[in-house]
Amino acid sequence: MTTFNNDMTLSELAPGEFGIVKEFTDLEMSVKLMEMGCLPGESVTVSRVAPLGDPIAINVSGYQLSLRKFEASTIILQ
């Protein structure tokens, strides 16, 4: 597994890579994501990416979620 220190979005990670949620770029989307357990400070791991890149399966807070690429692009990681 690889971890990143530079800020990047969740949509940029490949399967097996992980990061820590830092912030969100879309206020409306951030509410939805936080309700699903994707909170700042939480570790997020990409488990799978569909062949065309959409959706992206992630593990966060002990749950597996599927996000659209747009949704994943609103999550900034550290």
Predicted regions and their residues:
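Compact, glycine-rich, soluble single-domain proteins
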Residues: 1-78
